[in-house]
Amino acid sequence: MEALVYTFLLISTLGIIFFAIFFREPPKVPTKGGK
């Protein structure tokens, strides 16, 4: 059970950091949406 909790927390932390960097610095990839 503890392994599941630790894994979930680890993935959640990595996900939050990833999205924080992603939204702070938009990828320089041409998108059809524009903006």
Swiss-Prot record:
According to the record's subunit comment, the protein's assembly and interactions are: PSII is composed of 1 copy each of membrane proteins PsbA, PsbB, PsbC, PsbD, PsbE, PsbF, PsbH, PsbI, PsbJ, PsbK, PsbL, PsbM, PsbT, PsbY, PsbZ, Psb30/Ycf12, at least 3 peripheral proteins of the oxygen-evolving complex and a large number of cofactors. It forms dimeric complexes.
**Which segments cross the bilayer?**
3-23
Indicate how the chain sits in the lipid bilayer.
Single-pass membrane protein
Q: Report which superkingdom the organism of origin falls in.
A: Eukaryota
Keyword match Transmembrane helix = yes
Task: Please give the name of this protein.
Answer: Photosystem II reaction center protein T
GO BP term (any one): photosynthesis
Task: Name the InterPro entries on file.
Answer: PSII_PsbT (IPR001743), PSII_PsbT_sf (IPR037268)
- Annotated compartments: Plastid, Chloroplast thylakoid membrane
| Task of the protein | Found at the monomer-monomer interface of the photosystem II (PS II) dimer, plays a role in assembly and dimerization of PSII. PSII is a light-driven water plastoquinone oxidoreductase, using light energy to abstract electrons from H(2)O, generating a proton gradient subsequently used for ATP formation.
Keyword annotations for this protein, in alphabetical order, are: Chloroplast, Membrane, Photosynthesis, Photosystem II, Plastid, Thylakoid, Transmembrane, Transmembrane helix
